[in-house]
Amino acid sequence: SAASDVYKRQLLDRMAELKMNVFHWHLTDDQGWRIEIKKYPKLTEVGAFRDSSEINHFHSNVFDGKPHGGFYTQDDIKEVVDYAAKRHIMIVPEIEMPGHASAAIASYPWLGTTGKQIKVPCNFGVHYNAYNVADPRVIQFQEDVLEEVIALFPSPVIHIGGDELRYNAWKESPMVRNYMKQNKITSPGGLQVFFTNNISNFLASKNRHMMGWNEITGAQVNDYQRDGSGASQQQLAPGTIVHFWKGEPELIKETIEKGYDIVNSYHIYTYLDYDYESIPLQKSYEFNPIPEGLTEAQQSKVFGIGCQMWGEFIPTVESMNKKIYPRLAAYAEV
């Protein structure tokens, strides 16, 4: 919308004033697909719209009853990328995979593990739907989508999400279980790393680096992923940028020791949608993204900090601004 465009430009202007140089743009999720992909028009015809939105808080099961939707055309995206570039800001796009896939599966049911038609969810939080990574058509879909994304964003880094994958969809799929057996993969966490590495290889063939939330390492940082199947035996592809958001800070050190670069977005310090009681201004300002106990060479593997504004329960631009400012200025100083 015009209002959304104005707001994005205002945010990019503020970032430029604060000399912040990367804008991470989360473009797909369970509750909506927000970027036009010309090869798959239903992603925005179907996936960009939901019937209602959960309000108040997670798991409230209270809904506003108002249809919600919208997306950015490729021309819209080009304009924003250009506007940011003129202010020395690189935009890193995020296309979620293999979880947070409900909007895509609602658009094309064959992308999921059951093939059943679902609706774009109206409630927020983590959903059970995941891409059927055992189906070559689904891998082709991911590559087709990324091909169009790469053409729009000059960023050398492409973010593939990878967070909060519930393993149930894979465990309950005979096709996925057979695929794991064929590839000698012993756990769903290992399958996620295997899938992620295939996407990394594709991006590398296009001269792009992959970035993803820290579950892409196979770390089971969410309670619902600790299913007794054990840690992943698969090794994440070298050159991947790991976006740390959850888990014990020791995971950062372990990840760096394995040779990966890090962006630190530890949620208890950096989530802008958290209220000021959880993250007061002083806490924002004092956050050190480099954990203790690293050598000088290891410290250089921490690229910086990311601060996230998740919009589930942010109904207006005014309420968003109250949460972003002045904390954004504090993060710019970190």
Question: Where are the model-predicted features located?
Answer:
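Flexible, acidic glycine-rich loops studded with aromatic residues
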Residues: 210-334
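Conserved, mostly hydrophobic/aromatic
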Residues: 15, 91, 160, 203, ...
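Aromatic- and acidic-residue-enriched carbohydrate-binding clefts of CAZyme catalytic domains
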Residues: 31-86, 101-140, 168-188, 193
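Active-site neighborhood of glycoside hydrolase catalytic domains
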Residues: 104, 109, 119-239, 245-248, ...
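Active-site-proximal loop/turn and secondary-structure-junction residues that shape catalytic pockets
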Residues: 27-31, 39, 95-101, 164-166, ...
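Short, well-ordered coil/turn segments that N-cap beta-strands
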Residues: 19-21, 85-89, 154-158, 206-208, ...
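Catalytic domains of carbohydrate-active enzymes, especially glycoside hydrolases
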Residues: 9-30
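Short, small-residue-biased leader/transition segments that mark boundaries at the very start
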Residues: 2-7
